[in-house]
Curated annotation (Swiss-Prot):
Disulfide bonds: none annotated. The record marks C14, C29, C44, C59, C74 as: Not methylated. It is found in: Cell membrane. One of its GO terms (cellular component) is plasma membrane. Residues 1-3, 15-18, 30-33, 45-48, 60-63, 75-77 form a propeptide. It comes from Rhodotorula toruloides. It comes from the Eukaryota. This is Rhodotorucin-A peptides type 2. Rhodotorucin-A is a mating pheromone in cells of mating type A of Rhodosporidium toruloides.
Length: 77
């Protein structure tokens, strides 16, 4: 399921496990370490990263080819 080998997270609110530069909680994905990615806690609203685009409803990736997940709590595919 995980296309990106350096990023690993669960299906419940996106729990990062392997990527050292990205850190967020399980409640709506709160970024704390990656300076180029910024989003709110309500369904992950990207505001700075041009290559990643998703909606506010559970994180819908639309531009990043190596990362794909559904709107229900971020399911990596």
């Amino acid at each position: 399921m995980v296309a990106y080998p350096e990023i690993s997270w669960t299906r419940n609110g996106c729990t990062v496990a392997k990527y050292p530069e990205i850190s967020w909680t399980r409640n709506g994905c709160t970024v704390s370490k990656y300076p180029e990615i910024s989003w709110t806690r309500n369904g992950c609203t990207v505001s700075k990263y041009p290559e990643i685009s998703w909606t506010r409803n559970g994180c819908t990736v639309s531009k990043y080819p190596e990362i794909s997940w559904t709107r229900n709590g971020c399911t990596v595919a």
